A protein has these predicted regions:
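Acidic/histidine-rich catalytic cores and adjacent linkers
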Residues: 162-272
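Conserved beta-strand -> loop -> alpha-helix junction used to position metal-binding or nucleic-acid-contacting
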Residues: 110-118, 123-160
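RNase H-like nuclease fold core
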Residues: 5, 9-113, 118, 122, ...
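Hydrophobic face of alpha-helices
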Residues: 3, 20-23, 158, 226, ...
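Alpha-helix N-cap/helix-initiation sites
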Residues: 12, 16, 106, 134, ...
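Short, charged amphipathic recognition helices of the HTH superfamily
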Residues: 1-6, 176-177
Length: 272
């Protein structure tokens, strides 16, 4: 079974003994990864979650909490991950607290980017109270879907909402917001009301020039990793247990980071 999942994940066949050796090395690497000192040289912090299935002792859904940091020099690093029961405030509190205990005090941290989930936002405000929050504008626009009276409006109204955030100044954004409200209020008042609620909190990205502005306004930097993890996890359907899940996820992260892209690795080359 181990050789089968390795082939599914990485597209290569290896012996059972090699898999056993890799598993032992991964256990060591996972421990080191979760205990390593992070330091406090991060300018931006991205937080997100990915839901997966664990089958033992019973079949349950777990969420993989992930943190990506952007340093002062612009380099990116996957800081941590954790399997959690939910995205509640208490789980996010524990996850972020661990980052702080390992050196990420937040003295240089300017903004935290997330999908705007209430539990995460509450934990962020408590643990990094002086750090600005930038809700992902893509999630903000797509949240409209849940409040539509007519689902046939979905693509057009979301496109219009995303267009609002393409403006490069606060004045332009607010002008586009007024036009958006004028166009859609009579057709979709509930959706418009939801979009306007908390809108001003979504404009932190406008305080920065490009390309930082583009990078900050969505969760894309960390979503790229989650999409690749999701693509490789799907063939497995589920994990046998939390320890197996953590080991495999770490191995996948190591593999993904070592693929050609614009994100430097931590020290995953030790797995080679």
């Amino acid at each position: 079974k181990s050789t089968m999942w390795f082939k599914r994940l990485f597209g290569a066949e290896i012996s059972a003994q090699t898999v056993s050796n890799i598993v032992k090395e991964l256990d060591h690497q996972v421990q080191h990864y979760h205990r390593r000192w992070l330091g406090d040289d991060y300018r931006f912090l991205y937080l997100d979650g990915l839901w997966i299935t664990v089958t033992r002792p019973v079949k349950v859904k777990k969420v993989l909490l992930v943190a990506l940091g952007v340093k002062q020099d612009g380099s990116k690093e996957l800081l941590s991950f954790q399997l959690a029961d939910s995205e509640s405030e208490s789980w996010w509190w524990g996850f972020i607290s661990d980052l702080k205990q390992r050196g990420l005090a937040g003295e240089k941290l300017e903004a935290l980017v997330s999908d705007g989930a209430s539990g995460l936002v509450k934990a962020h405000r408590a643990l990094y109270p002086r750090v600005s929050h930038q809700p992902c504008t893509f999630h903000k626009a797509n949240d409209i879907s849940a409040h539509l009276a007519n689902k046939r409006h979905r693509h057009r109204i979301i496109a219009d909402a995303l267009y609002v955030f393409e403006a490069t100044t606060a004045t332009q954004v607010r002008k586009r917001l007024r036009l958006f409200c004028g166009k859609w209020w009579s057709k979709e008042p509930k959706a418009v009301r939801n979009f306007v609620r908390g809108f001003e909190h979504c404009l932190t990205y406008l305080e920065y020039p490009d390309p930082i502005r583009t990078m900050l306004k969505t969760n894309n930097p960390v979503e790229r990793y989650l999409q690749e993890l999701r693509r490789r996890i799907i063939p497995m359907r589920s994990f046998n247990n939390p320890k197996s899940a953590e080991r495999i996820i770490y191995g996948l992260i190591a593999y993904v980071i070592n693929q050609p892209q614009d994100v430097p690795n931590y020290e995953f080359t030790q797995l080679a």
